[in-house]
């Protein structure tokens, strides 16, 4: 199963770099979730729809993939994310995405986004714009 986990993480990073949100959503279980520092817990499909609506382009530079020891059902993708939002602002940060897989499958049940940005105030402003999109409201919350 570890080979499958690694393949999922690499496919995720490739799809994110290509802004291919349909492929990303296909990696998740139907009720999969994403927890974001700025948006909180929300359904994965809604999170990636919202991200896609706010994104002009992505450049993903993989750094490493961390696989579990034993029979644990999680793995971590570590990468540099150069995110260009629709207004043209470029936000660059390193990310460690913690994937939790559904038992006996290679479907992502939960994704926890772990990152820091060099300019948190600017990043929060961009994420607030992202979270304020009424057409994509999903019950997620924006952090202050």
Where are the predicted features?
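Short, low-complexity N-terminal intrinsically disordered segments enriched in polar/charged residues
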Residues: 1-30, 129-144
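Intrinsically disordered, low-complexity segments enriched in small/polar residues
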Residues: 3, 10, 19, 45, ...
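A solvent-exposed, acidic/Ser-Thr-rich amphipathic alpha-helical stretch
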Residues: 18-74
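A beta-strand edge to alpha-helix "cap/lid" segment located at domain peripheries
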Residues: 49-144
């Amino acid at each position: 199963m570890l080979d499958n986990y690694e393949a999922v993480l690499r496919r995720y990073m490739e799809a994110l770099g290509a802004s291919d949100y349909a492929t990303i959503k296909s990696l998740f279980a139907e009720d999969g979730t994403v927890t974001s520092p700025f948006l909180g817990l929300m359904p994965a499909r809604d999170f990636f729809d919202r991200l896609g609506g706010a994104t002009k382009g992505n450049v993903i530079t993989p750094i490493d993939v961390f696989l579990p020891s034993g029979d644990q059902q999680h793995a971590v993708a570590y990468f540099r994310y150069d995110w260009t939002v629709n207004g043209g602002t470029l936000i660059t940060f390193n990310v460690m995405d913690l994937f939790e897989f559904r038992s006996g499958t290679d479907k992502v049940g939960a994704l926890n986004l772990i990152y820091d940005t060099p300019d948190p105030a600017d990043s929060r402003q961009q994420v607030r714009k992202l979270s304020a999109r009424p057409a994509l409201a999903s019950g997620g919350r924006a952090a202050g």
